[in-house]
């Protein structure tokens, strides 16, 4: 198995190549396609049954899919709005904060659970199929204060991919909201990645990918072993970079990279 350090080295090399390509190529269409795939897979992890094509029709064409629930439609629409909000944050160089987190969660649950959208939970919760028991509600504010303190201290010295993975895992583990913690955590992870110029990291919603994701999280939560989770996220970022570059014209890539040397 590869080490985190070796994957991060490959990530840095590919990121440098992508930065060169972005100076000369329009990548808006690619970015939009990957955003649709991200929100499809993120919702799929949580049990949404819309297909990738149906998701695209709902968010881009405004269609209603027969046989699918209103909640599933709203989850897709809200996720798209959350990504647009994140894009605005990145373009305006707005840093992660408690206000930003609650805004993102509020968008995720908009029209689904108005009472709890953007609000820390007031009830204890248990996660089906997990040995991890999220903290009691009275502990949440102190834990979330520590969450943002960690971010502000770590953002200047951790590799961006490791930072994104840490903020993802820590938020899922604290589980501050009554619902939407997973989707919000994956959005926060990608907010950080986008802020540092990386493409969206997509975690698959198929059974094997979902189980690998849950198992890596469980290992952090029950054994305090972060290696598998950080490795998983790093591999997703590496794949995203490889895919992004490969989608672009091979000849144009070769020309641009040669010209930059």
Where on the chain are the PLM-derived regions?
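FIC/Doc superfamily catalytic core
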Residues: 1-261
């Amino acid at each position: 198995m590869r080490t985190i350090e070796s994957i991060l080295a490959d990530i840095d090399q590919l990121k440098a190549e992508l930065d060169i390509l972005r100076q000369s190529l329009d990548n808006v269409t690619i970015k939009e396609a990957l955003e649709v795939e991200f929100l499809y897979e993120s919702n799929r992890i949580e049990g949404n049954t819309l297909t990738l094509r149906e998701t695209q029709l709902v968010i881009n064409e405004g269609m209603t899919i027969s046989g699918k629930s209103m909640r599933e439609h709203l989850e897709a629409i809200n996720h798209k709005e959350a990504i647009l909000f994140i894009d605005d944050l990145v373009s305006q160089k707005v840093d992660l904060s408690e206000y930003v987190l609650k805004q993102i969660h509020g968008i995720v649950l908009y029209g689904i659970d108005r009472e709890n959208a953007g609000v820390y939970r007031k009830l204890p919760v248990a996660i089906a199929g997990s040995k991890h028991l999220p903290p009691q509600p009275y502990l949440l504010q102190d834990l979330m204060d520590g969450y943002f303190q960690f971010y502000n201290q770590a953002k200047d010295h951790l590799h961006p991919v490791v930072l994104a993975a840490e903020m993802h895992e820590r938020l899922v583990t604290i589980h501050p909201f009554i619902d939407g913690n997973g989707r919000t955590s994956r959005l926060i992870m990608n907010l950080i990645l986008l802020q540092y110029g990386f493409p969206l990291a997509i975690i698959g919603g198929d059974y094997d990918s979902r189980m690998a994701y849950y198992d890596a999280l469980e290992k952090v939560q029950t054994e305090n072993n972060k290696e598998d989770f950080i490795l998983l996220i790093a591999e997703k970022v590496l794949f995203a970079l490889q895919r992004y570059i490969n989608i672009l014209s091979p000849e144009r890539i070769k020309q641009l990279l040669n010209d930059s040397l």
